[in-house]
Amino acid sequence: MRGNVYLLWGATTTGKTAFSVSVAKERGWSVIALDRFQGYHEISTGSGAPTNNELEKTERIYITPQRGLADGIITAKDYNYWLKSRVLSLPEGKSDFIIEGGSVSLLKEMVSDEFWADFLWEIKIFRAPSKDVFIKRAKRRITDMLHPEDGRPSIMDEVSSFFMNHKTIHPLEDIDGYRTIIDYCRCKKIGFDKLKIMTTDQEKIIISGIAEEYYAHALWQEQETPCFPHSWSRRW
């Protein structure tokens, strides 16, 4: 048995990150993000990566290759490979950790890999609340992405900067949140380098659109969550 893993699984806005910080502080464990996007600095705001203040001095590890987002998003297969390498490199006495996230593709890759059977698992699943509650929470979070108070660029700034630096918005259009912004700009013929001129009403439309996108994705995540294999020893 290699060590203990506490998996915190669920959709966005369900409280996983805050809970992971609480557990990390209590147990002294690191948190590994089960997310293919949060490790890219170009999209730290819109991907939902927690701020340093939110992490409260706990360690959060991102499994991201040493390349930029323009070179493509890490695949689930590659993520699993690098995650295993990272776990095997943990120092003796620090082999217990938390995995927190909601990526279906990553979890499916892990449950099909016998490597992960050699751990003692504790699993907590965060269910999406009612649609009204979810949308309210999501809108609050998206508003913070549009107007961050921690010095980070807004999600709009991230779209503009990526477009101006690379003359493309791929692969942003494949990511929740960014997809809604890009589709809206195309529909309204707004240049990706002109997002600072968005009106309050336009922002409200985008916020509502992203919230609905998040909710639809949350329902899909719950439907597509793979079964945990019997080979995973677990404590519930």
Curated annotation (Swiss-Prot):
One Gene Ontology biological process: cytokinin biosynthetic process
Superkingdom, taxonomy of origin: Bacteria
Protein name per UniProt: Adenylate dimethylallyltransferase
EC number: 2.5.1.27
Lineage: Bacteria, Pseudomonadati, Pseudomonadota, Gammaproteobacteria, Enterobacterales
Function as written in the Swiss-Prot or TrEMBL entry: Transfers dimethylallyl groups to AMP as part of the biosynthesis of cytokinin phytohormones.
InterPro entries, sorted: P-loop_NTPase, Tzs
Catalytic activity: dimethylallyl diphosphate + AMP = N(6)-(dimethylallyl)adenosine 5'-phosphate + diphosphate
Keywords, comma-separated and alphabetical: Cytokinin biosynthesis, Transferase
Enzyme category, top tier: transferase
UniProt organism field: Pantoea agglomerans pv. gypsophilae
